[in-house]
C-alpha cells in the first residue's frame, strides 16, 4: 500500500464526518443516524459505492434540507469527499466505510428515504452481486421507507438492461427510465433536475470521454 493511501487512512480515522465500523456486527447507532450522527431530523439519502463522494457532496450542497451518507469500502477515495465536506462546513454530509454486503446491519426499518447507485460495478459475470439484483434489493427493503426511491446512473449497458428487467419482472414502480440521459431526454427535465445530473463522478467523466452513453432510472421497490 502506498504512503499516500496510508496517510489518507490515518486522516479519515480523525475526520468527524467519517464512520468506520466492523463489517459483520450490528452498528450501535442503527436507527439513530439522525439523532446521534447527523444530529438533526432531516431525511437521509444514501450514495452506495460512493467512491470520492461526488454525489453525496454535490447533492448535499443543492439540498441542505436533506442528509447525505456516502458509503464505500475504499477509504482513500472517501477521503476526497469527506475532506471537501469538512472544508465547506457541510453538516448534512457524512461517510461510512464498510462493504455494501453488510448494509442492513447499519439501518433500521424506514430509516432511509432514498438510495443513489452511481456507476456501480456491473459485475458482468456475477449478476447476483449487481447492486440492483434481488439479493441487494431485498437488503434495501429492510431499511428504505415505504415509497422510497432508488436512483441508478450508469454507463453500463449490461447493468442497465439487467436493472430494467428487474423493474419489469418484479413490478417495481418506475418513475423515470432513459437510455440516453444527456440526449433529447434533457428537454423533459426541470432546471433543478438538470443541475442534479450535472454532478458527475470520476467514473462518469472517464467513461463519457470514451464515448459511453449515460443511462438513468428511478424506481420504487
Task: Go through each PLM region and give its residues.
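Conserved beta-strand signature within the Rossmann-like core of class I S-adenosyl-L-methionine
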Residues: 147-154
Amino acid at each position: 500500500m502506498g504512503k499516500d493511501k496510508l496517510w489518507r487512512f490515518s486522516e479519515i480515522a480523525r475526520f468527524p464526518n467519517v464512520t468506520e465500523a466492523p463489517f459483520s456486527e450490528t452498528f450501535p447507532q442503527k436507527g439513530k443516524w439522525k439523532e446521534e450522527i447527523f444530529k438533526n431530523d432531516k431525511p437521509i439519502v444514501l450514495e452506495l459505492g460512493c467512491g470520492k463522494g461526488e454525489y453525496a457532496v454535490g447533492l448535499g450542497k443543492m439540498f441542505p434540507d436533506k442528509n447525505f451518507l456516502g458509503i464505500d469500502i475504499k477509504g482513500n477515495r472517501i477521503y476526497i469527499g469527506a475532506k471537501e465536506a469538512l472544508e465547506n462546513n457541510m453538516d448534512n454530509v457524512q461517510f461510512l466505510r464498510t462493504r455494501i454486503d453488510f448494509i442492513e446491519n447499519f439501518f433500521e426499518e424506514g430509516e432511509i428515504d432514498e438510495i443513489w447507485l452511481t456507476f456501480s460495478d456491473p459485475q458482468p459475470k456475477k449478476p447476483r452481486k449487481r447492486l440492483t439484483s434481488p439479493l441487494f434489493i431485498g437488503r434495501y427493503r429492510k431499511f428504505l421507507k415505504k415509497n422510497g426511491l432508488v436512483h441508478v446512473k450508469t454507463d453500463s449497458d449490461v447493468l442497465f438492461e439487467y436493472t430494467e428487467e428487474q423493474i419489469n419482472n418484479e413490478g417495481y414502480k418506475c418513475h423515470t427510465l432513459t437510455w440516453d440521459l444527456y440526449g433529447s431526454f434533457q428537454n423533459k427535465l426541470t432546471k433543478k433536475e438538470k443541475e442534479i445530473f450535472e454532478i458527475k463522478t470520476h467514473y462518469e467523466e472517464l467513461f463519457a470521454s470514451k464515448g459511453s452513453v449515460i443511462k438513468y432510472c428511478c424506481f420504487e421497490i
